[in-house]
């Protein structure tokens, strides 16, 4: 099962809207087949493993990180393939919360006389697909707030200089973080100040997430890099009252305008809209104002902070969170440290909501 989890982990960022899944087939104490789900619409991990094992699948044990699917989607049900192959035992790490599966796969396997063992390395399997599980059950995206700051919580100097607070190694790690999310969200002030591309620059490539700009008054410069680079779709969340001609200029360039008649835009409403648009995981790379909006809404799942060993000072220097903030410690967002690691000269701190 540990190997199956490793196979699944290697595909993070590639399979959305499907979960990452790994499978290993063992017979007579030898691995005879293995596989991972590589991309939505392509064969699932179980099918790759069965194809590799061939006739050796009969009487073998399959270890799989997620309950095999029992429904017809882009591909046929994996349960039927397992039964037809004559697998004798299926060891499942975690059940699938998708209402189309949700225990049905396991019941179908048992009904065919195949032994099923559940819960092996379950916690590791759950963590591997945390955004998928959350979005399926809560009907909204899994939200990660990403922050790069000095020790005193500053994200730029008082003159606006921010390149670069963190080191090169941290910035490279951010590209993998982007790769594992469906979309990146920033505020229009970040676009105006930094003109970012928000793409993924990994060795050997990587997935470029959808880029979302919060821009109620449609102030995004038409000449901004991401508007014309064609690296990934750009969505602008704006007001339906914005200038019609300006809207047409963006639409001519392939920009999707999501019009929300709220001032300011409520984070809950935004997440509901994004979920309906197919976004399961959202990486927020906004400035202090956008971060503060998510903080006050309480609608975020984890925070990833890249902390550089420098002090900037100045009351006027932008902070990780700005705006009204939380008035009482009683209402402060309580988190738990999940992981702390050194990356170059920086610290990467991952904290999750309690």
Q: What is the meaning of each model-derived region?
A:
Residues 1-2, 7-12, 16-18, 34, ...:
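Enzymes that bind and transform nitrogen-containing heteroaromatic metabolites
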Residues 7-10, 52, 131:
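Solvent-exposed, charged/polar functional surfaces in cytosolic regulatory/catalytic domains
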Residues 13-17, 41-42, 106, 120-148:
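Proteins enriched for Cys/Gly/acidic motifs involved in redox and nucleic-acid/cofactor modification
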Residues 15-29:
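N-terminal glycine-rich anion-binding loops that anchor highly charged ligand groups
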Residues 21, 80-82, 149:
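Short, flexible segments with low predicted structural confidence
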Residues 25-124, 210, 230, 235, ...:
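Zn2+-dependent cytidine deaminase-like catalytic core
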Residues 99-100, 126, 291, 313:
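Generic structural signal for helix capping and beta-alpha/helix-loop junctions
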């Amino acid at each position: 099962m540990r190997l199956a989890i490793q196979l699944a982990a290697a595909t993070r960022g590639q399979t959305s809207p499907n979960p990452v899944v790994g499978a290993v087939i063992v017979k007579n104490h030898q691995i005879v087949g293995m596989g991972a789900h590589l991309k939505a619409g392509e064969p699932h991990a179980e099918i790759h493993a069965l194809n590799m094992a061939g006739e050796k699948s009969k009487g073998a044990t399959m270890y799989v990180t997620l309950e095999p699917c029992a429904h017809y989607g882009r591909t046929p049900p994996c349960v039927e393939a397992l039964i037809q192959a004559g697998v004798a035992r299926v060891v499942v790490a975690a059940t699938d919360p998708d209402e189309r599966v949700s225990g049905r796969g396991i019941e179908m396997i048992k009904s065919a006389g195949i032994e099923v063992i559940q819960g092996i390395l379950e916690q590791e399997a759950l963590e591997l697909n945390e955004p998928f599980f959350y979005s399926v059950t809560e009907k909204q995206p899994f939200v990660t707030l990403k922050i790069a700051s000095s020790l005193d919580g500053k994200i730029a100097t008082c003159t606006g200089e921010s390149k670069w607070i963190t080191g090169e190694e941290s910035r490279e790690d951010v590209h993998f973080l982007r790769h594992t999310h469906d979309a990146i969200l920033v505020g229009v002030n970040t676009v105006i100040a930094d003109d970012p591309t928000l793409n993924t620059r990994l060795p050997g490539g990587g997935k470029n997430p959808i880029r979302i700009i919060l821009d109620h008054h449609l102030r995004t410069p038409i000449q901004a890099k991401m508007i014309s680079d064609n690296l990934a779709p750009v969505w602008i969340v704006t007001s339906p009252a914005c200038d019609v001609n300006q809207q047409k200029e963006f639409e001519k360039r392939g920009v999707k305008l999501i019009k929300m008649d709220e001032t300011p835009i409520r984070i809950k409403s935004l997440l509901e809209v994004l979920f309906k648009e197919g976004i399961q995981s959202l990486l927020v790379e906004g400035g202090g104002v956008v971060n503060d909006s998510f903080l006050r809404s309480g609608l975020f799942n984890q925070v990833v902070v890249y902390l550089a060993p420098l002090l900037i000072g100045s009351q006027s220097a932008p902070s990780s969170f700005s705006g009204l903030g939380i008035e009482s410690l009683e209402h402060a967002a309580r988190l738990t440290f999940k992981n702390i690691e050194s990356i170059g000269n920086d610290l990467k701190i991952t904290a999750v909501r309690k």
